[in-house]
Design a protein with these regions (language model features):
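Phosphate-coordinating loops and pocket residues in cytosolic domains that bind phosphorylated ligands
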Residues: 68
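Recognition helix of helix-turn-helix/homeodomain-like DNA-binding domains
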Residues: 33-47
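DNA major-groove recognition helix of helix-turn-helix/homeodomain DNA-binding modules
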Residues: 50-65
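A short, Lys/Arg-rich alpha-helix, primarily the initiator
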Residues: 1-22
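Short alpha-helical "recognition helix" segments of helix-turn-helix
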Residues: 27-28
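A generic alpha-helix surface/boundary motif
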Residues: 11, 49-50
């Protein structure tokens, strides 16, 4: 099974956040990061693997499904 690429990860993150009613500010607070930084990672402007893994874990997604 091929790994999902960044657009799949971005969509899945946004879907989980919407479904679970998690705001960017709440996610940023959980990860001790700024909301601007979180948005830039989610939208693909920053490719921080570590942050993507932490966002995935915080939202209950399997980070291994999104390895590029």
């Amino acid at each position: 099974m091929p790994h999902k690429r960044l657009p799949d990860w971005m969509n899945d993150v946004k879907l989980v956040m919407t479904k679970d009613n998690i705001s960017v500010e709440e996610l940023a607070s959980r990860l001790n990061l700024t909301s601007n930084y979180i948005v830039s990672v989610i939208n693909g402007y920053r490719r921080s693997i570590c942050t993507r893994i932490n966002i995935s874990k915080a939202l209950g997604l399997n980070p291994g499904d999104y390895i590029m």
